[in-house]
Amino acid sequence: MQRTAIGLALVWVALLAPVADAHHSYAMYDGSVYKVFTGVIVRIIPNAAHFEMHFVPLNEQRDALVRDDKGQPLVWVAQMESAAQALKDGVTRESFPQGTVFSMGIHPRRDGKPAGDRGMSGLFQCAKGTKPEPGKHCDSVAGNKAFGAGEIPKEGAA
């Protein structure tokens, strides 16, 4: 009887372990603030738990990539919900190939690392071969495409 109970407990733990491991707390992100970016896709990582968009922001004039202290492109990581939700919204490697210009807001990491969570922000892709006017985002470009619900949030407090 005791062996059966231990066996069942082990099976239960084994079944729940992937669920517990698949998600993490959002405490690392400042959900009270949005940073809004227009950037260029470097790569897409469709992780099952959290879809990631790696990108380099464009400067406010929209004519150059933002660079770090060493002159290298400053790559940010935008975490989204699951790959299944991203697919439902139409966000795939094929719909966002390397070099795609897009805009979205993210809740930045509290530790200052160049990463954040999309939250409820809209995601807009500029029409191929276009970019926004200085200080604007892809939602202002003729022929833009929206992915999922939401609008580009205002920079600052959410």
Identify the role of each PLM range.
Residues I6-G7, A83:
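Short amphipathic alpha-helical "recognition" segments used for binding
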Residues G7-A17:
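Bacterial N-terminal signal peptides
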Residues G7-L8, D21, K88:
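Short, functionally important structural connectors and interaction interfaces within domains
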Residues A27-A158:
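PEST-like low-complexity, intrinsically disordered acidic/proline/serine-rich tracts
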